[in-house]
Amino acid sequence: KGLDLYTYTNVTGVRLDGEKRVQGVDTDKGFIPCGKVVNACGVWSPEIGRMAGLEIPVEPRKGVILVSAPSFKFCNQKVQEFGYMISKFSNHECKRDPELEKYEVSFVIEPTDANNVLIGSSRNFAGYDISTEMEIIHVIAKRAIRFYPILKDLNCIRTYAGLRPFLADHLPLITQVDEVPGYYIATGHEGDGISMAPTTGRLISELIAGE
């Protein structure tokens, strides 16, 4: 049957009946009746969860990326240091430079089709703030130059930040909610949401279909 896609539509509430069964979703463009709701809202999943009386322990974990000016192709694939996994899992048993520890900085580089490179990355908790602090930029740049000295000769043309949906056990939350029949959750993938999307979609579809 296909689907209807509602773009630029804000969810304002999840309607439940007296037995807490899902009845539909309220939006700023009207009510959408449905018996199943999947909360796959990443860092905003706690807000949508509260609409159904649920507390979802996801926190936004910020990451900053630097973008270089175009250059000759000195990097043809994504490269990351092993410390990336140490930062991701907040393993403080492995002692590193204090400035790396402060913002969980580890080196990762990825080329683009336009011969820019994306350079990261950091991990810190700053709520929903997506500003890029100069201190973090300097730490990322310093770490990157240690691995690729050529980077010191490139200009950084911009920076940006994103938010990862973090859970304390570092495992995604993919489940149906027995207390609220018809409510499903798929969140907490942190930085692995794209790579885990196919499996997550399959698991959620099987839960909904009762397979």
Predicted regions and their residues:
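Core beta-strand elements of the Rossmann-like FAD/NAD(P) dinucleotide-binding domain
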Residues: 6, 26-36
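A conserved beta-strand/loop element that lines the FAD pocket in flavoprotein oxidoreductases
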Residues: 2-11
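C-terminal lid/capping helical subdomain adjacent to the catalytic/cofactor pocket in oxidative enzymes
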Residues: 3, 18, 171-211
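General beta-strand structural signal in soluble alpha/beta enzymes
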Residues: 6-7, 39, 119, 185
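Helix-loop-beta segment of a Rossmann-like dinucleotide-binding subdomain
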Residues: 1, 22-24, 122-126, 181, ...
